[in-house]
Amino acid sequence: LADGGFATGTMMGSGGFIVLDEDQCVVKHTYTLARFYRHESCGQCSPCREGTGWLEKLLHKIETGKGAIKDIDLLWDVQRRIEGNTICPLGDAAAWPVAAAIRHFRDEFEWHVNNPELCLRENYGLAHYADELKVDAV
């Protein structure tokens, strides 16, 4: 199975895989993975320590409706600078899900950027972000 993931360019990190239906948000799940890897980084090498922090910050920005197209491009650049440049494989595992998500679902990232309020309303119900966005009275 892992070989198939490499062959299709869809590795989601450390050998695991996640199956999402069309109702799930790729950006939200990628952000969750980035948070995990940032937390797990020991901080010994700069590409992983700094890179995982940047991945988390940029994905949070996009997920919460504050992102721009340039943030998607920066995400791509950051993950490229992590992969292959760390002491242990955790950095690679952190970069792979971001690369796979952008490679296969860039349109969903762009949708988040171009429709922030709609995205939050449809995907997250605004309950978690109620203090950050102006919501129409019901």
Give the residues covered by each predicted segment.
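Redox cofactor-anchoring modules in respiratory/redox and cofactor-processing assemblies
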Residues: 1-138
